[in-house]
């Protein structure tokens, strides 16, 4: 029961992150103040600075797979070999990589492995957004520093143990491989980086048991419609299914990266292709 509880809490924390992602796009609520207040709170609960992520995520959208994309370090280069991703996910589940995840969400420089250049997302934004991000990071730190003391004040030792075991522990273990695998399913092992229709992927969450399980674990709040999200990032998550149907009806997704989840997983877990020798 304890393990099942940890898994379910980690899945729920991922769902909260997806909502904070919508808030980062100003799409959680039309009223911007409410959008940002709730987006900050939702992100804060799982250790994410929504305002910092807003800056970082803009670079991902504007420079997908380009030299300024801070997310390439996460999803780029796949397939990387059968064992590579399993080792990464095992390290995530063991909590070994959580510090890297939260460094990313706090705007730490990301290393582009192709150019060996550090991408500094917080240098490429307005003074106001930079100030908002700085304030938000401070609030996230205060929130998580205060949480165990609040839990103790409310329920003593049992409260602190509940906070640690049923919130902090799944946040640094179960949540981590979910974040990685979902990001790789969205962009890993795509067919053509030059086209917006093939550099991002929509994963079907209908039509088979495997797809439905993927919806529950990896793709809450319609985040599986990632190709459509990259084409039209101003569309809120609850409109993405209708957008997908419209684009399919018009033939706009012919040849696009739209796959069943098992097909995506086969691709990202495939053996690394042989390296081409220069001039060959």
What is each residue range found by the language model?
Residues 32, 36-42, 193-207:
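Membrane-cytosol interface motif
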Residues 190-194, 231, 242, 248-250:
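Polar-ligand-bearing catalytic/cofactor-coordination segments
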């Amino acid at each position: 029961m304890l393990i099942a509880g940890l898994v379910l809490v980690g899945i729920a924390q991922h769902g909260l992150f997806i909502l904070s992602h919508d808030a980062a796009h100003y799409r959680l609520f039309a009223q911007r103040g409410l959008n940002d207040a709730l987006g900050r709170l939702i992100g804060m609960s799982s250790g994410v600075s929504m305002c910092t992520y807003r800056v970082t995520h803009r670079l991902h959208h504007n420079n997908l797979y380009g030299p300024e994309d801070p997310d390439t370090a996460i999803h780029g280069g796949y397939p990387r070999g059968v064992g590579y991703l399993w080792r990464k996910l095992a390290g995530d589940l063991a909590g070994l990589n959580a510090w890297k995840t939260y460094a990313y969400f706090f705007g730490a420089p990301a290393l582009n492995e192709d150019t060996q250049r550090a991408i500094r997302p917080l240098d490429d934004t307005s003074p106001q957004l930079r100030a908002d991000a700085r304030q938000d990071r401070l609030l996230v730190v205060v929130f998580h520093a205060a949480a165990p003391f609040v839990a103790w004040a409310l329920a003593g030792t049992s409260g602190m143990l509940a906070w640690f075991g049923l919130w902090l522990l799944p946040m640094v273990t179960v949540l981590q491989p979910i974040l990685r695998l979902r990001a790789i399913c969205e962009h890993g092992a795509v067919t053509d980086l030059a086209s917006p229709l093939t550099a991002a992927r929509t994963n079907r969450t209908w039509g088979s048991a495997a797809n439905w399980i993927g919806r529950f674990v990896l793709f809450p709040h319609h985040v599986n419609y990632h190709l459509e999200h990259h084409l039209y990032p101003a569309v809120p998550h609850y409109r993405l299914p209708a957008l997908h149907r419209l684009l399919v009806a018009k033939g706009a997704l012919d040849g696009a990266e739209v796959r069943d989840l098992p097909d995506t997983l086969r691709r990202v877990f495939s053996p690394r292709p042989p390296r081409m020798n220069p001039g060959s």
